[in-house]
Swiss-Prot record:
Residues 1-61 form a transit peptide. Residues 92-249 form the Tyrosine-protein phosphatase domain. The gene is LSF2. It comes from Arabidopsis thaliana (Mouse-ear cress). The lineage of its organism: Eukaryota, Viridiplantae, Streptophyta, Embryophyta, Tracheophyta. Substrate binds at residues 83, 153-156, 161, 177-180, 194-199, 230, 245, 251, 259-263, 268. Starch-associated phosphoglucan phosphatase that selectively dephosphorylates the glucan C3 position. Probably participates in the regulation of starch degradation. This is Phosphoglucan phosphatase LSF2, chloroplastic. Disruption phenotype: No visible phenotype under normal growth conditions, but starch of mutant plants contains high levels of C3-bound phosphate. Induction: Expressed with a circadian rhythm showing a peak at the end of the day and then decreasing to reach the lowest levels at the end of the night. Changing W136A: Abolishes starch C3 dephosphorylation. No effect on phosphatase activity with p-nitrophenyl phosphate. One of its GO terms (cellular component) is chloroplast. Changing F261A: Strongly decreases starch binding and starch C3 dephosphorylation. Moderate decrease of phosphatase activity with soluble substrates. Nearly abolishes activity with water-insoluble starch.
């Protein structure tokens, strides 16, 4: 792996130290000012793999920088997210559970080699639409081809970026694919969208909520404490409601209290699990 002999970092927010402020995988913005809060390289929780020997902005084209700026502007406006995606730093990811990794898009076949060799990834769940892949100039065919060569199952469940209603509608099928891959037990599942800050965390939180005996807040806090991000909790609540109350006489979700379906009864969880598993292969 010629390019994968690159820098990688492992970190969590819990042990953040001032002397490591210059090592960055994400940038968060303080409410009052544009403080550049950097995440350190030497902590457990999040692993960020850089695709170049010297990641940074020096070798980034103006076109690429404009794309990142436009994308991060849209993310702030539509998701009210203080986080930023830096495509030029390469693929980054976080081990959420032993069987589950959440991250940004693989950018080249060498990233697939890295996931296989370093993280024992056996399944990749891609939540991007075709237009997302085209926007970032990713050669998906080469990535899928490398997955096949390495025996990695590549799955797609597209959802529209920055769109809670799209995420809500696609969550059941996406979680169905994720839960199936986990149940196969052949290796870790890598769930990604473009930045790994919205759709991929949302699907992973829904999976933990519906299948790991957690309420929504516990599942949400578990993920964001390891990977700082801003997935839409309302989309997960809405999808939970859609699955648990699948009847024509149900009251509109919009009329329910703000915290509705942040927890479910055991019988509702079993019903949701049955309905999600029934979506396998659809």
């Amino acid at each position: 792996m010629s390019v994968i002999g690159s820098k990688s970092c492992i970190f969590s927010v819990a042990r953040y130290t001032r002397e490591n402020e210059k090592s960055s995988c994400f940038t968060s913005i303080n409410k009052k000012s544009s403080l550049d809060l950097r995440f350190p390289r030497n902590l457990a929780g999040v692993s960020c793999k850089f695709s170049g020997e010297n990641p940074g902005t020096n070798g980034v084209s103006l076109s690429s920088k404009n794309k990142m700026e436009d994308y991060n502007t849209a993310m702030k406006r539509l998701m009210r997210s203080p986080y930023e995606y830096h495509h030029d730093l390469g693929m980054n990811y976080t081990l959420i559970r032993d069987e589950l990794i959440v991250g940004s898009q693989p950018q080249k076949p060498e990233d697939i080699d890295h996931l296989k060799q370093e993280q024992n990834v056996a399944y990749i769940l891609n939540l991007q639409q075709d237009k997302d892949i085209e926007y970032w100039g990713i050669d998906l065919d080469s990535i899928v081809r490398r997955c096949k060569e390495l025996g990695i199952r590549h799955m797609r469940r597209p959802a529209k970026d920055f769109d809670p209603l799209s995420l809500r509608s696609q969550l059941p099928k996406a979680v169905s694919s994720l839960e199936w891959a986990v149940s196969e037990g052949k290796g870790r599942v890598y769930v990604h969208c473009s930045a790994g800050l919205g759709r991929a965390p949302g699907v992973s939180i829904a999976y933990m909520y519906w299948f790991c005996d957690m309420n929504l807040n516990t599942a949400y806090d578990t993920l964001v404490s390891k990977r700082p991000c801003g997935p839409n909790k309302g989309a997960i609540r809405g999808a939970t409601y859609d699955l648990a109350k699948n009847d024509p006489w149900k009251e509109p979700f919009e009329s329910l209290p703000e915290n509705a379906f942040e927890d479910i009864a055991d019988w509702e969880r079993k019903l949701i699990q049955e309905r999600v598993r029934a979506l396998r292969g659809t």
